Every structure is written in C-alpha cells, then in structure tokens.
C-alpha cells in the first residue's frame, strides 16, 4: 500500500453497505493521489452496525490530499484519536550496512469501549528496502508477542488492525 485513509465515529462494519463504502473510499483516495485503489488501506473505527455515507469522504478527501506533507505525521496521529488522551507516534532512525533507515509508527486506541469492544489502529512505515514476504514474516512474528497481547475488555474488535508499508 502507498496510502492510508482512516475515519472515526463509524466502524463501517456489520452494516448493509460497508464493503461498497470502503471500495468507493479507496477509489476517491486513489483518484486524489494518482495511485491505484488497491494501493490504499481503508481503516475505520467507531460505532458498529451504523449505516455509513460516502458523502463526507467525497467532500473531505480532496482537501486532505492537498494538505499532505512530510511533516503531517503529528496531525495524522492526532486525527485518528477517539477517546485517546495522548497521541501515539514514534519514529527512529538506524543504520543498516552504512545506510540510514527510518521506521515510524502511529496508533490509535486506549479505552474506547463502544459497544463492548476497543479498536486499535496501528500504522507503521519504513524506508527500508525489504521484500513483501520478509516484512510480512517480521510483522507476523512481532504482532504475536506485542499487539496480540493487548486487551481492554477481553474482546477483539472487528476493526483492530496493524499495517506496515515499506
């Protein structure tokens, strides 16, 4: 994936039009950024089972695309907060064979329990040159001992996710 679009207030799951809304959202983002719809990750958090309208995406995505910048990480980390009391973002640089590499991440999730679940959304990016198979293996292994150990109320949300883009 090349882009992520996240919304809050509506989980876009267990409703009549969730798949269609997600597909149309990815098309809108792709059009605004000049990429393919399959290169867009769509993430949603909020109330489960509510109908969702495409209209906020139709009006909001063009404006969001214009505001994209390399310095926008803090705005993005703040924007995905729901009941979080602090934004969660980090970036580190390190050397691999004499080349400077960067790994960054942001997350949303704290104690949002409505209805009876908590959603965490996690987005990791890196400029490390790594194959899709190797990064998937690394992500799967680390998720087992970190992300999958989180619990707030004992339930997994329909929308919990962690993604990595390299």
What are these language model-derived features?
Residues 1-20, 24, 30-166:
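A structural signal for small-residue-enriched, beta-sheet-centric alpha/beta enzyme cores
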């Amino acid at each position: 994936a090349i882009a992520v679009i996240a919304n809050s207030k509506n989980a876009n799951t267990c409703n009549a039009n969730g798949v269609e809304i997600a597909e149309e959202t990815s098309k809108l983002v792709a059009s605004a950024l000049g990429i393919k719809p399959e290169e867009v990750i769509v993430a949603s958090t909020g109330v489960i089972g509510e109908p969702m309208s495409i209209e906020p995406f139709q009006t909001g995505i063009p404006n969001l695309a214009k505001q994209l910048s390399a310095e926008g990480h803090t705005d993005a980390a703040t924007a995905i907060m729901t009941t979080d009391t602090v934004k969660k973002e980090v970036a580190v640089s390190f050397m691999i064979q004499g080349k400077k590499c960067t790994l960054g991440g942001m997350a949303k999730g704290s104690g949002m329990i409505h209805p009876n679940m908590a959603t965490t959304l996690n987005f990791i990016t890196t400029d490390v040159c790594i194959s899709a198979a190797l990064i998937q293996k690394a992500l799967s292994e680390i998720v087992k001992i970190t992300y999958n150990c989180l619990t707030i109320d004992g339930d997994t949300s329909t929308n919990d996710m962690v993604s990595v883009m390299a």
